Design a protein with these regions (language model features):
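Membrane-embedded alpha-helical bundles of multi-pass transporters/translocases
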Residues: 1-187, 192, 198-296
Length: 296
């Protein structure tokens, strides 16, 4: 129960700030793709640091630091966005976009690492589906809250709500870590440098047809999703402009963008929940996992 509740809380916090991230990012207009490049570079740079920190610190201390650090950083963005204007404010929004995109990767990765360390394989098979449903419910709640409050709170204020969400997740994280039987790292010897471990992982990936197949599947899926994603943002950039317009119009259009993305997230997660609960198991039994993935 605590695992599902924590995942719901974390995804709820993320979906409180995700529409604001998108609304700010669209302001980049023709150079929107650079934000994706910035996210890729930031993720690549952060990965060895993340690997080093996971190897160096106990998981409970590192998890606390990551989620609390995320909350403090979001509070900093809330302050910075309120104290700037014009091009400088847009720049803060672009940095916020890259930060949130990178945070989403590591916050989710860390959660599932904790789950993998804390549950035996037989227990994991029974519980991980339930935990995933909990995350979807949290995403629904966060999206619904943004949509409900979009006429009352500004997109900037959603950042502060997200900061509160990540900070308050510690009240679920600490008892969860105490209840899991195996959250400590399994080895106590010297750890290999993160770069060496990354290279070893790359060699293993290149030698395994199974891993290569998964990689190609994910690459193709991501390529198609990226194309649709960028095209939809290009449409909104022109439909709801925030550049070269009056400040009041820019603010109103930013609010409209935020509400739009919240509703998209709400619909997406509602469909995902229905599929998780009623369709996935049946489709796997009827079609087989390979055919189901190919159809996607």
């Amino acid at each position: 129960v605590l695992s599902a509740a924590l995942f719901a809380w974390l995804l709820g916090a993320y979906y409180l700030i995700q529409p604001t991230r998108e609304a700010f990012g669209i302001s980049a207009g023709p150079v929107y793709e650079l934000l994706w490049t910035g996210t890729a570079v930031a993720t690549l740079l952060a990965t060895p640091i993340y690997g080093w920190a996971v190897a160096r610190f106990p998981r409970d201390r590192f998890a606390t630091g990551l989620y609390l650090g995320a909350a403090l950083a979001l509070a900093g963005f809330w302050i910075a966005h309120g104290q700037t204007e014009g091009a400088l404010r847009r720049t803060v929004g672009y940095v916020f976009y890259v930060f949130v995109s990178t945070l989403a990767v590591f916050a989710t990765t860390l959660f599932w690492a904790l789950m993998a360390d804390g549950h035996r394989p037989d227990t994991a098979r029974r519980l991980f589906g339930v935990i995933s449903v909990g995350g979807t419910l949290g995403a629904l709640g966060g999206s619904a809250l943004v949509d409900a409050l979009s006429d009352t709170l500004s997109p900037r204020d959603m950042i502060l709500l997200g900061a509160f969400g990540y900070a308050s997740s510690l009240f679920l994280l600490r008892p969860l870590l105490r209840s899991l039987p195996n959250t400590a790292p399994k080895t106590t010897g010297a750890h290999a440098p993160p770069l060496r471990e990354a290279l070893a992982g790359a060699r293993l990936f290149a030698k395994s047809p199974y891993l290569l197949g998964i990689g190609l599947f994910l690459a193709g899926q991501t390529l198609a999703a990226t194309f649709l994603y960028i095209e939809s943002r290009e449409f909104l950039f022109h439909a709801l402009p925030t550049r070269d317009v009056a400040e009041s119009v820019a603010q109103a259009n930013t609010v409209a963008r935020t509400s739009f993305f919240a509703r998209i997230n709400l619909a997406y997660n509602a469909i995902a929940l229905l599929v998780q609960l009623f369709l996935v198991g049946r489709l796997v039994r009827w079609l087989g996992l390979g055919a189901l993935l190919a159809s996607l």
